[in-house]
Amino acid sequence: MRKLFTSESVTEGHPDKICDQISDAVLDAILDKDPNGRVACETAVTTGMVMVMGEISTKCYVDIPKLVRETIRGIGYDRAKYGFDCETCSVITSIDEQSVDIAMGVDEALESKKGEMDKLDAVGAGDQGMMFGFATNETKEYMPMPIEMAHKLSRRLSEVRKNGTLPYLRPDGKTQVTVEYENGKPVRIDAIVISTQHGPEVYLEQIEKDIKEHVIKVIVPSELLDENTKYFINPTGRFVVGGPQGDSGLTGRKIIVDTYGGYGRHGGGAFSGKDPTKVDRSAAYAARWVAKNLVAAGVADKLEIQLAYAIGVAKPVSISVDTFGTGKMTDEEIVSIVNKVFDLRPGAIIRDLDLRRPIYKQVAAYGHFGRTDIDVPWERLDKVEEIKKHI
C-alpha cells in the first residue's frame, strides 16, 4: 500500500521561531545563574517591537533587553533593510512572579504531603496534561523522514545564508517535504517546497537554480529523488518582506515543527520558555527518550508513548503505548518494561536527564528531537541494554 505524508520546518528567522529562541535565551540565562529558577517566559514580535512577558521566580538578575537584542542579532536581523533590526527595535518587558498556588504543588507534591518520604516525590508536576513521545527506525535519527528531511533543509538554508554561499538570502524561510511510503517504509520524496526570504535584487530564476544546487542536492540523497519529484521554490514568485515585518510571531506557535511533524500525536503543550518543572517540556523530552530507547532495543519498529500527569502529583496518572502493529510484544508488556526501567516522576526526569542546565536555546529552532548536530540527553541511547534484559 502506498501513501504520502508531509511535514514542514521553518528557519530560525521565522517570526514564531524568533520568539521561541528569545524565550529560551531568557530561560538559559536564568538557569545558568539559578538552576532552581522557575520560568514561564512568553515572547511576541511584530514590526519594530518585541514584548517579553510571563512569570519568573529567581534569585538572580538577567538583562532581558540585552538578551533579546543578542538573540535577534545572532539570527541575522541586524540591519534596517531586513525590516527588523536588533539595534533599533523596541523591547517591552512585563514579568511577574510564579503563582504561589502553583509553586505550592510543585515544591511539595501530593505524595510528600501524605508522608511518602521519597525525595523525588517532593517535586510535583507543574501542571496537568498529557505528553507524547515517538520514535521510528525509518531513519538513523529514529525520526519520521518527512520532518527530519524538512529540518535538514531549513538548517541548510541558514547555513548558506550565513557562510556567504547565497548572500542574498534573508533569515525567514520555510521548508516542506512530502515522502511516499510503501508498506510503511519511505521509498521516495514526492515533493519539496522551499520558501526563503531574499533581497530585492535577485530574480526567481536565480533563486530556483541556487536552492536546487546548494540546498536540495546537498541535503537530499539522490536515490530519494526521481523525474516525478515536484519542486516548489518560492511559489508566490517573491519573498522580500518577511520576518516580524511580514507576520507577527508568538512563542509556542510551532509545536508540530518542534516535535514529529504531525507523524506522532501531540499533547498540545509548547516547550520554549518553560523550566523543567513544567511537564509540558520535561515529560515530552522523557517520552521521546523512552520511545527512542525502546525502538533501538528492538521492542518495535515504530512506537508512541503517552504520559499523563496531575498538577502537584509526582507519579504519572497513566502510561500507554501504541506500536502500530510493529511491536514484538504486547502493549501491556511494554508498559511493564517502561515502569521497570524508567522513573517518570518530574523530579526523576530532571535528575536523570540533568535538565536544570542552560541547554534549551539550542533546540528552539530546527527541532527538539532527532538532533545529531548537538548533544541533548533525551536523545541518548543509554537504556537499550537494560531494556533488552526485560524482553
Swiss-Prot record:
ATP binds at H14, D172, G173, K174, R238, F239, D247, R253, K254, A270, K274. Pathway: Amino-acid biosynthesis; S-adenosyl-L-methionine biosynthesis; S-adenosyl-L-methionine from L-methionine: step 1/1. Binds 2 divalent ions per subunit. Gene3D superfamilies: 3.30.300.10. It is found in: Cytoplasm. Mg(2+) binds at D16. Its EC number is 2.5.1.6. It is an enzyme of class 2 (transferase). Residues 98-108 are annotated as: Flexible loop. SUPFAM superfamilies: S-adenosylmethionine synthetase (SSF55973). L-methionine binds at E55, Q98, D247, K278. Keywords: ATP-binding, Cytoplasm, Magnesium, Metal-binding, Nucleotide-binding, One-carbon metabolism, Potassium, Transferase. It comes from the Bacteria. K(+) binds at E42. One of its GO terms (cellular component) is cytosol. Signal peptide: none annotated. Its cofactor is Mg(2+); K(+). The keyword Nucleotide-binding applies. It catalyses: L-methionine + ATP + H2O = S-adenosyl-L-methionine + phosphate + diphosphate. GO terms for biological process: one-carbon metabolic process; S-adenosylmethionine biosynthetic process. Transmembrane segments: none annotated. Belongs to the AdoMet synthase family. Homotetramer; dimer of dimers. NCBIfam families: metK. This is S-adenosylmethionine synthase. It comes from Clostridium botulinum (strain Hall / ATCC 3502 / NCTC 13319 / Type A).
